[in-house]
Structures are given as structure tokens and as C-alpha cells.
Amino acid sequence: MQGKSVSIGAAGSGVYFNALDVLDAAGLSISDINPQYQSFEDSKESMKDGKIDAAFVVAGAPTTAITELATTNGVNLINIDGDLRDKILEDCPYYKAKTIPAGTYKGQDQDVDTITVEATVIVDKDESEDTVYKLTAAIFDHADEIAKENAKGEELSIDKASDIQGVPYHAGAAKYYAEHGVTVNTDES
């Protein structure tokens, strides 16, 4: 990517910080590329028009922007694997290894190894235990209904609830998880 025009997300966005992590692990910095600070939609249009060479996209697969590009222009997904992925996972524990299965996008004939970040609901630590318990229950008790509206809902899993590290879980969420046999870190634990 050195010297290439690359969309790294809007300045200060999650995509921007994820791009910095990947560049750093690859031994690159923003000064090594021609950074473009664009949304997914703008990145998609810039790729279509040949204005950029690459774009960081931090979204669940399949995502609309890539699906559209794969259909209209064709795309090449870049593996984040081997030593690069190992370094990212070691330096940044909030990432997980992920494989995008072959056939997810038109023209993608092979699996693509990459990294992922988990979506997280954050609440104020002073929010009532009852409110947070009810919010957590609303999400997990209705995961099948969420999945009907959005395929990413199929990834909601009580078993993955304890995967997030470094930030304590609210007592209301911890209560719900405990009722379902999952122990999570709280300020009290």
C-alpha cells in the first residue's frame, strides 16, 4: 500500500483507528500512504471512479459497499494473515481472527483471512441494574427476531458474552449472564 491512495475512514472514526493499527503492524504509517478520510459510501464511489486504490472497511461480511463493488467493478480482498495478523492480535487484544468464507462476494473464490472487532453496547456505570438487565435480556431473549431483520443478528451469542476484556461489565448485564451460566468481569470481581 506504500504510496497508494487509501481510504482510512473518517478522521477519528473507528475505521480510522483500526486502519492505524493495521498500518502500524505492517510497519507503515499514514505518511507512507496517500490517506483519504472517507465514509464507506464515499470509499465505494471513489473505488468505482478509480480515485483511490484501496479502502479499509470495518463492517460485517457481507457488507453492502463491498457487495456492490464486487458486482459492478470487481474487488480484491486482501488477507490479513500470518505474522501480520499475529502481531495485530498480540498488540491489540480487542481484535479477533476471522475468515470471510469463499463466495461471500462475487468473484471471491477463496477464503480470506482477516481480523474483526466485536460490536459492544456500552452503558453508563451509574445506570440502574434493573435497566441494564432488561436491556441485556431484550437483546439476547430476542436474538432470533433480530436475526430475521439483519443477518448479523445470527452472530449474537450468550456464549461469546465474556469475550470482551479490559472493560468491566455492568452489574445488570452480569446478572443476566450469570442466570445463563456465563461469568463476566465486573468492578466487583
Could you say what each language-model-derived stretch is?
Residues 1-49, 163, 167-172:
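Bilobed "Venus flytrap"/periplasmic-binding protein-like clamshell domains
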Residues 42, 49, 59-77, 84-94, ...:
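An extracytoplasmic/periplasmic, membrane-proximal ligand-sensing/linker region
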Residues 3, 26, 47, 55-56, ...:
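Broad hydrophobic/π-residue packing in well-ordered secondary structure
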Residues 11-21, 94-165:
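Ligand-binding clefts/hinges and TM-proximal coupling segments of bilobed small-molecule sensing domains
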